[in-house]
Amino acid sequence: MEANHQRNDLGLVALTMLAQYHNISLNPEEIKHKFDLDGKGLSLTSWLLAAKSLALKAKHIKKEISRLHLVNLPALVWQDNGKHFLLVKVDTDNNRYLTYNLEQDAPQILSQDEFEACYQGQLILVTSRASVVGQLAKFDFTWFIPAVIKYRKIFLETLIVSIFLQIFALITPLFFQVVMDKVLVHRGFSTLNIITVALAIVIIFEIVLSGLRTYVFSHSTSRIDVELGAKLFRHLLSLPISYFENRRVGDTVARVRELDQIRNFLTGQALTSVLDLLFSFIFFAVMWYYSPKLTLVILGSLPCYILWSIFISPILRRRLDDKFARSADNQAFLVESVTAINMIKAMAVAPQMTDTWDKQLASYVSSSFRVTVLATIGQQGVQLIQKTVMVINLWLGAHLVISGDLSIGQLIAFNMLSGQVIAPVIRLAQLWQDFQQVGISVTRLGDVLNSPTEQYQGKLSLPEIKGYISFKNIRFRYKPDAPTILNNVNLEIRQGEVIGIVGRSGSGKSTLTKLLQRFYIPENGQVLIDGHDLALADPNWLRRQIGVVLQDNVLLNRSIRENIALSDPGMPMERVIYAAKLAGAHDFISELREGYNTIVGEQGAGLSGGQRQRIAIARALVNNPKILIFDEATSALDYESEHIIMQNMQKICQGRTVILIAHRLSTVKNADRIIVMEKGEIVEQGKHHELLQNSNGLYSYLHQLQLN
């Protein structure tokens, strides 16, 4: 009976953790009620059905240990004895396995022997159906197919123009043949004049059509470029906060900049060269008519180009990958250095930073040079094949002319036609580095575009928030193998109540507000506003109705008015001024020469720290949110500015639910209730004077420290 109960607990815990990993919230009691019908725990079948009910795609497989590195992780290792555990990562180099022990609620690293002892060969692979749809519509070269279909009329016109260009290219060698074999032999000046005029007309049409094709093609690809750029930025802003917290800013910027490579590829000569190559069969037919032997030489050279490209491509791709990695490191270091310029100058560490930059730059230049050398070798190999074919054709063609099987005019025409065939091949071979580069760019950009955006079940968009907040049995960690940040937190906040949250650093205060903003979904439990589960809510609907002021706020390089009215640019000036007065910002803004039209500079560099903070507070208040979060919002203010805000606090809090997070207890002492947190748990709560009566409590201890 105990084993069954244990299996029930571990199966449910595993399902909860995997659902959280895929940004899906669940109620364990509801799952137990629906699928644990006999009270003996979730069986394999009921576990799979429960996962399906949560919009998870779960599949039970049997896998040998030697092939575990090929599966998508994390996965559930299913045990017949009920002692299931999560497989998080396989380290093939060191034969180690990162697992999560559900019984001990802690990550474990197992050796090969230890893992073999507990692994029974059964896995449950879990993916969200949203991610499955994302994989089917993932960003790669196939993404451009719908775009091509969308502009199929324009591309069809380009195709028709290309056909005419190939016909004109076919006519020119024929004219030269007539001149060599007929006009020169018979001294036909009238025929020469006619052919010259006709050739001039053909050349004019060819130039016009070629320019028209380039214009239409570039116009179409520019539209695709705009669509891709717009899609990229929208997707980037829709990604969850965890995406940005787990990546360096420079890495993300480097990936976004790969759009330039794709843009250059789309608007360059590569695609028109592909079109020219597709019509080569027309030339082959005419060339075969002239001389099958010479045509076979040309055809025989094509596999040489292909084989040479196949040989060079893998090496080139590896070197391009390395070049991108070095470039991303440089980009990240540059962004980090510029962002931290005040610290660098204050600590006089510019020489150390310069030394690091020089080393990274040298590494990038070396990597770039290796790419250039290999690309040059590739191009010279193509030139070698081309020159060899030219020599063979010259020798064989001369033999055919001498033997009378081919006229001089036909030989010249044949060489011109072969040039039309080989030219796009050579261009493509020379552009092969661009093909490889754009392939890597698509992959790197796919890292952004294929990352799942913030998902929510049911698109729950409700009317205006009233402000009743409930945290029920909240358990949360940022990663499956990370320590628990919040553990069994239960908290009810009444509508219009002012709550102060205090505690040591790392106690989980800010994490609680991140869950309230739905930046994350709890591993266990529910966060509710007005009785509605935020796991099912539209994040944009929620965040529009919550005002947040952090310790370090970012202002955009716009005017003060635009920064305050960021969410509604058409907002009446009266509302902007009222919010600024509440935040204690109106007086210093009025003293500025441009007033509310003053440009604040990048990240508010033109203002002091206290001024930036007051504008951020005004920005949070201007929409009259029903829930207001101050996360160390006044810690960066001078005492005068803080005094102004605290004087206005009664007006600020009126009609709102307010959460004040602070280290300075003076900020929260007038709150309706103070919550004291320690190691992810609520250890005390009450009013200021009530908490001080407990001399052994954490609040009293912190208060005494600040008094001293």
UniProtKB/Swiss-Prot annotation:
Function of the protein: Part of the ABC transporter complex LktBD involved in leukotoxin export. Transmembrane domains (TMD) form a pore in the inner membrane and the ATP-binding domain (NBD) is responsible for energy generation.
Domain Peptidase C39 intervals: 1-126
PROSITE patterns with a match to the protein in the record: ABC_TM1F, ABC_TRANSPORTER_1, ABC_TRANSPORTER_2, PEPTIDASE_C39
Outcome recorded upon mutating Q104K: In strain: Serotype A2 / PH494
EC number(s) from the headed UniProt entry: 7.4.2.5
Gene: lktB
Subunit-level organization: Homodimer.
Domain (ABC transmembrane type-1): residue spans on this chain: 155-437
Species per Swiss-Prot/TrEMBL record: Mannheimia haemolytica (Pasteurella haemolytica)
Gene3D superfamilies in the cross-refs: ABC transporter type 1, transmembrane domain (1.20.1560.10), Cysteine proteinases (3.90.70.10), P-loop containing nucleotide triphosphate hydrolases (3.40.50.300)
Membrane topology: Multi-pass membrane protein
Domain description: In LktB the peptidase C39 domain, the ATP-binding domain (NBD) and the transmembrane domain (TMD) are fused.
Localization per Swiss-Prot or TrEMBL: Cell inner membrane
GO cellular component: plasma membrane; type I protein secretion system complex
Protein name: Leukotoxin translocation ATP-binding protein LktB
SUPFAM superfamilies membership: ABC transporter transmembrane region, P-loop containing nucleoside triphosphate hydrolases
Keywords: ATP-binding, Cell inner membrane, Cell membrane, Membrane, Nucleotide-binding, Translocase, Transmembrane, Transmembrane helix, Transport
This protein's record includes keyword ATP-binding: yes
Main location as per UniProt: membrane
Biological process, per Gene Ontology: protein secretion by the type I secretion system; proteolysis
